[in-house]
Amino acid sequence: MRIKSLVLALVATLVFGAELSAQNGNITPVPAIVRGGVCNGEVCSPAVPFDYKQPFKLSFEGVDMVDAQRLEAAAVAAGLDVKRVKHTAKRGYLHFTVKPEMIHDDEGYAIVTTQDGIIVTANTASGAFYALQTMRQLVESGDWQTGIIGDYPRFEYRGVLIDISRHFRSVDFLKRQIDMMARMKMNRLHLHLTDAAGWRLEVESYPRLTSFAAWRTPHDWKGWSNSGCRYVEQGSEGASGGYLTKAEARELVAYAADRYITIIPEIEMPGHSEEVLEAYPELKCSHKPERQADLCIGKEATFEMMQAILDEVIDIFPSEYIHIGGDEAAKNSWKECEDCKRRMREEGLKDVDELQSYMIHRIEEYLNSKGRQIIGWDEILEGGLAPNATVMSWRGEEGGHIAAEAGHKVVMSPHGYCYIDAPQDAPYSQPESIGGYLPLEKVYSYEPVPTTMPKEVGEYILGVQANLWAEFIVEDSHYEHMLWPRAIAVAEIGWSQPENRDYADFRERAIKIVDGMIEEGYTPFDLKNEIGNRPESKQDVDHLARGKKVTYLEPSRYYAPKYAAAYDATLTDGKRGTWTYADERWQGFLGRGGVDVIIDMEEVTTIHSISADFMQICGPGVFMPCLVEIAVSVDGENFTKIADIEHEVIIDELPSFKSFGWQGETQARYIRYKAHRSKYTGFLFVDEIVVK
């Protein structure tokens, strides 16, 4: 009777929302409600330390056998000493009640801790499991007090993408990441199984996908990419790669399910399919025998293959969603392919965007007939979205918002916040990566549903996902370093209510989690030693040319639209760049020209120095200039060169930053600054031309 009354009191608290929003520094993601002490009717007791080391009598109500076994295992993993009993004990109990509509959300939970024991209430077994993850953190903190915790997730989808195509990962490695995801109350693991770099799932109907397309030489993606992207037969000399057998995949699915995580498999189509086309070249577009990336949509054999593969995939993975990729199809080969042109004529398709949409629609219809739904990258919007498709928005937020406005479900994973393959600290201090800079604070700042979005549109946002691509991540230790703790930030975005989130508080909690992970043998980024952003970017620089007009000469006036920063004001706006060229401070130049600009100082001025910073990150094709010329003029017509600065551009792995400038004394109104690109094709990035 006492247990029942406590449960009812707690449920009333959660439903009617008393003022209980104090945060608990030991729980991540931060819970919705934490209250010290317990009230039973008019009798209230203050919070006191709770003896969590005592033996507990474990009992269940409304829990089936499978879930009871899972919850008992989770209780043991949480560090609790439990013994199953049939009936609820009077003291020293850990009792679970799982009934529909008891709590705010299906994944929500409530914990009442008294001196007599612990009561957990949840709508579903997954909610009870998340309660145990909270209890695990209380045990690890050594600070568990009597009181009430009421919690529920903000979003139903809280995920991580792990890329095992670029570099294959073992089942044991994936299990370790699943363990940590579960502790952070994440519930979706998106496995990127196929891409140009290798096919990673056994398919019996097309065996060359694993006997050939899963193996390459050399082992590392960068070396493989630079040496011609060559696939080799399994077992041949130097062959490197691997794949999940069906048995291993099923083992992984079961392991995740025991932790209430759903694995969503991704089978890329129609783009990113080089490995498929090298294993089965008959699926290439008809006019080009050489290497291709896009499946031929004109050939019916393509659909026969994809449907056969999907039949085997859905037999392994019980997930509601099957991810079908849909991103970055080049589409060029379709324009010339006779089979594709015939398909377009027969189906009345006006362009290649509609041709891709035709394939996505057919695949969706097929998967719907099997009781599954498709999810794809936001390119599936192009040419018309399939009626039941869910969109994963990665190129920004716009695609997701468009899909939500059209009534489609959306998972937000925008590049600028959720692509955690970029360095998380000063790039020179980090292992080689794809470039950029995405610190924990930037990840944590992401808001999936803007305040300007109408409520009825925001309801289509299912949640959020961190994506970790592995082009430059060879070792498992490096992968964990990139994944954690940034995935923890995404977990809190997905779970916690926005009014409860605070970065300073989160960072302190994340440091504790990272320290614990290191003790357990994980290799996360050690947040305590974070260097932070580029010092030059932390405050505006005041100089003689600040705010002055900049004229861009041909061809440099065509700075790349994607990296326009503040447009024509960029180079004299007083803002220095951060560690990343994507910060809207660095201005990027691409093409045959370099940087060639004239600054009008408005009047003849005494000048002692002129300089500008450039960056080099070779992975994404960002290089230093090979020559910088600086000239000055009084009238804007006749220029006198005052500096020729030569630089040998050397390919290296680590990002670098360099200032190219002149010092001396001169009188001038106009300054011409010209930076020449080197023999390496790619971008030049410059942030500010500083004149003193």
Task: Describe each model-derived feature in a short phrase.
Residues 23-155, 478, 490-520:
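Contiguous, structured surface segment used for ligand recognition
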Residues 168-170, 196-202, 270-276, 323, ...:
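Flexible loop/turn segments at secondary-structure boundaries
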